[in-house]
C-alpha cells in the first residue's frame, strides 16, 4: 500500500494532487476546485485513500438523529395512518433540510410520517421545466426509475406532484457524492477505486439487461452510503435502446463523454451503444486516482475539436500506479469502442480485479477502503441557506402558498389568463404525470395470489386496449414540445 503522497503525484515538478503547470483544476461541477491546506490537528477520514483536507464539521448528523429520534419517539403513538388506497403526496412527508441542487431540481432530506423512514426527495418546479424544455427528460427519468431496482443504484420509492412541483422520493445516501469528496481533496487508494469500478460494473451490467444507457456517469452522479459503497444516480438524460438499435444524440457531460458520441454527432455513422458508459467509468477512475481527468476537456470545447483531440493526445499514466491498474484504465479508455472493456465479463477477467469476490460484492459484504465521516453531512451547507433565504418559493412554506394561490385563482376570471400556453402545459403535466409507490407495489407482490375466475362468455367482442399504447409513457405532445434524445 502506497502512501498518500505517492497516490497523487507523477513527477517532482508537480506537487501531489496538483495539475501539471499551466493546467489549473477548473471549478464547478465538471471538475473539483483546489482547497487550501488543512489546519493543524484537523481530523482525517479513515481510508486506505486518506484525506489531506477535511472541513470543519458542517452538521453533527449523529447528534441530530439522536435529538430527532427522541422527539419523534414521543410522537410515535400519534403517528399518522394514511389510507392505503390514497396516493402518496407532499403531506405524507416531513421536510428536514436541503442538501443539494441538480441540473434542474433540488434535493432535501425527508421523513415519511407514517413509517418514519428517511429518504431523499428531489423536487422540480413545473414552470421552470417547461421554460427550459425539460419536461420530457423528467418524464423519461420517471419511466426508467419506476422499472428498475438494484443494490448499486439510487432507487425510486415514490413519485407524485402538486400544482407547483414534481417530486421523486429516492434512497437516502448520507456519504456524499464523489465530486464532493474530490473537492475535499480525499486521496483515493487503488483498492478503493477498484471497488468503485466493480460496483459500477455491476450497476452497468444490470442497466444493460434493461436496455438502458445512462450517458452521464461521473463523480457528481455517484453517491456513497454511510459505509462507503457507490450508487449511481441521475437518469434524466438516460435512454432506452432496443436490441440492435444505436443511440445518436449528443448527450452527456463533455469531459466524461466517449469519443464515439462526438464522432457520431460530427461525422454521422452508426451511433453508439452501452460502451460509452464504460468510458465514463474509466475517466472517473482516473480522476479519483490522480485528481484531474485524463483529457483536458471542458464544456466550452467545440465538438469538432474534441474529435481531433482523441486521435492526437495520449493519456499519461502515473509511474507509481500498479501495472494492473494502468492496464485496466487503458482498456476502459480505449478510443475504439470495439476494443474497449465494456462488459461485466471483461471486468471480471481483468488482472487488476483477479481477487474480487463478486458474490460478496453484490451483497455489500466487501468493506470499502474509504468510509465517509459519520459525524458530518457530506454536502455544501449553502444549499440550505439558499432554500431558506434566497428561494422565492421555499419548500417549507408550500402549504400556505398553495392555499393562498388557490384562493386567488378562484377569485380571478380564468378567461383572463396571462399565458394560455403555459397553463396548457401545466394542465398536460398534471394529467400525464405518473404517480408511483414502490412500497405499495412490494406489498402487493408479497400477497398470495388467488386463482382467477373462469372468463364469462361474451356475446359481442369488447375493445381491447393496445398493450404498446398502455405501456407508453404519456408526454405533453404538441403542447410542450421537447427534444428527444435517442
UniProtKB/Swiss-Prot annotation:
It is an enzyme of class 2 (transferase). Belongs to the protein kinase superfamily. Ser/Thr protein kinase family. Residues 24-33 have a biased composition (Low complexity). GO terms for molecular function: ATP binding; metal ion binding; protein serine kinase activity; protein serine/threonine kinase activity. ATP binds at residues 99-107, 122. Its EC number is 2.7.11.1. It catalyses: L-seryl-[protein] + ATP = O-phospho-L-seryl-[protein] + ADP + H(+); L-threonyl-[protein] + ATP = O-phospho-L-threonyl-[protein] + ADP + H(+). Pfam families: Pkinase (PF00069). SUPFAM superfamilies: Protein kinase-like (PK-like). This is Serine/threonine-protein kinase 32C. Residues 396-405 have a biased composition (Basic residues). GO terms for biological process: intracellular signal transduction. Keywords: ATP-binding, Kinase, Magnesium, Metal-binding, Nucleotide-binding, Phosphoprotein, Serine/threonine-protein kinase, Transferase. It comes from the Eukaryota. The modification Phosphoserine is found at residues 10, 15, 18. InterPro entries: Kinase-like_dom_sf (IPR011009), Prot_kinase_dom (IPR000719), Protein_kinase_ATP_BS (IPR017441), Ser/Thr_kinase_AS (IPR008271). Residues 1-56, 396-419, 444-486 are annotated as: Disordered. The gene is STK32C. Residues 93-353 form the Protein kinase domain. The active site is at 216 (proton acceptor). SMART domains: S_TKc. Its cofactor is Mg(2+).
Amino acid at each position: 500500500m502506497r502512501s498518500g503522497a505517492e497516490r497523487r503525484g507523477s513527477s517532482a515538478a508537480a506537487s501531489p494532487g496538483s495539475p501539471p503547470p499551466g493546467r489549473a483544476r477548473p471549478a464547478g461541477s465538471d471538475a473539483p476546485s483546489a482547497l487550501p491546506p488543512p489546519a493543524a490537528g484537523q481530523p482525517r477520514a479513515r481510508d486506505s485513500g486518506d484525506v489531506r483536507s477535511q472541513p470543519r464539521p458542517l452538521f453533527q448528523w449523529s447528534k441530530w438523529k439522536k435529538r430527532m429520534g427522541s422527539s419523534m419517539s414521543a410522537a410515535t403513538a400519534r403517528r399518522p395512518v394514511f389510507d392505503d388506497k390514497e396516493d402518496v403526496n407532499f403531506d405524507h412527508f416531513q421536510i428536514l433540510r436541503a442538501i443539494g441542487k441538480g441540473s434542474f431540481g433540488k434535493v432535501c432530506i425527508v421523513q415519511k410520517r407514517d413509517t418514519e423512514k428517511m429518504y431523499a426527495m428531489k423536487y422540480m418546479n413545473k414552470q421552470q421545466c417547461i421554460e427550459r424544455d425539460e419536461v420530457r427528460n423528467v418524464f423519461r427519468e420517471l419511466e426508467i426509475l419506476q422499472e428498475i431496482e438494484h443494490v448499486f443504484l439510487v432507487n425510486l420509492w415514490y413519485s407524485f406532484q402538486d400544482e407547483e412541483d414534481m417530486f421523486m422520493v429516492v434512497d437516502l445516501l448520507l456519504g456524499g457524492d464523489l465530486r464532493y469528496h474530490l473537492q475535499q481533496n480525499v486521496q483515493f487508494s487503488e483498492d478503493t477505486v477498484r471497488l468503485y469500478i466493480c460496483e459500477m460494473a455491476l450497476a452497468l451490467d444490470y442497466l444493460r439487461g434493461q436496455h438502458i444507457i445512462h450517458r452521464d456517469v461521473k463523480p457528481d452522479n455517484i453517491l456513497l452510503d454511510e459505509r462507503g459503497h457507490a450508487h449511481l444516480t441521475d437518469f434524466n438524460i438516460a435512454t432506452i435502446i432496443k436490441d440492435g438499435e444505436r443511440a445518436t444524440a449528443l448527450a452527456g457531460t463533455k469531459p466524461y463523454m466517449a469519443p464515439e458520441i462526438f464522432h457520431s454527432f460530427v461525422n454521422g455513422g452508426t451511433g453508439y451503444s452501452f460502451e460509452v458508459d464504460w468510458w465514463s467509468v474509466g475517466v472517473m477512475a482516473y480522476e479519483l486516482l490522480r485528481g484531474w481527468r485524463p483529457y483536458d476537456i471542458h464544456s466550452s470545447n467545440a465538438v469538432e475539436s474534441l474529435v481531433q483531440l482523441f486521435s492526437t493526445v495520449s493519456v499519461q499514466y502515473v509511474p507509481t500506479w500498479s501495472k494492473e491498474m494502468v492496464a485496466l484504465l487503458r482498456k476502459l479508455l480505449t478510443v475504439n469502442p470495439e476494443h474497449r472493456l465494456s462488459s461485466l465479463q471483461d471486468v471480471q477477467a481483468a488482472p487488476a480485479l483477479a481477487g474480487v469476490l463478486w458474490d460478496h460484492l453484490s451483497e455489500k459484504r466487501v468493506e470499502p477502503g474509504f468510509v465517509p465521516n459519520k459525524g458530518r453531512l457530506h454536502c455544501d451547507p449553502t444549499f440550505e441557506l439558499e432554500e431558506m433565504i434566497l428561494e422565492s418559493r421555499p419548500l417549507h412554506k408550500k402549504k400556505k402558498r398553495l392555499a393562498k394561490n388557490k384562493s386567488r385563482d378562484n377569485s380571478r376570471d380564468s378567461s383572463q389568463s396571462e399565458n394560455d400556453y403555459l397553463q396548457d402545459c401545466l394542465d398536460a403535466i398534471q394529467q400525464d404525470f405518473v404517480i408511483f409507490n414502490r412500497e405499495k407495489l412490494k406489498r402487493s407482490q408479497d400477497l398470495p395470489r388467488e386463482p382467477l375466475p373462469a372468463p364469462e362468455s361474451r356475446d359481442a367482442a369488447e375493445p381491447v386496449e393496445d398493450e404498446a399504447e398502455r405501456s407508453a409513457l404519456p408526454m405533453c405532445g404538441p403542447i410542450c414540445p421537447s427534444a428527444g434524445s435517442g
